[in-house]
Amino acid sequence: MFPEDEAALSDAILDTAGPLQILGGGTRRVGRISEGRKLSTAQLKGIVLYEPGALTLVAKTGTPIAEIENVLAGENQMLAFEPMDHRVLLGTQGTPTLGGVMAANVSGPRRIQVGAARDFALGISFVVALANY
């Protein structure tokens, strides 16, 4: 299942009676892996709002970190927490995404000085098991 918006994601969850295997950018697997129906967040991507003067960016969970960094670089800005790309260390492929960074709190060497990834999140919306969003 590859839902393209929150409503389709909600429907996919409601239509599944058993366990779900949530798939993101595919850079690494964390936790107990479910053998359930596969549900990908890959199509839930894109920058919804960017206000450089307010240092505010809103993006969907499947948005690649590289896309966010490119947009920020255009305004001489960056992600202060420097999300680490684990692919080389883990020998994996895939695309690091905003959802993965926030879920795993992936932060680089500046974490000690400026804070972790989640410290920069002003808000997060998500679909719960009852398919509310």
For the regions a language model picked out, list residue spans one by one.
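Glycine-rich N-terminal segment of FAD-binding domains in flavoprotein oxidoreductases
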Residues: 1-87, 91
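FAD-binding subdomain of flavoenzyme oxidoreductases
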Residues: 82, 91-133
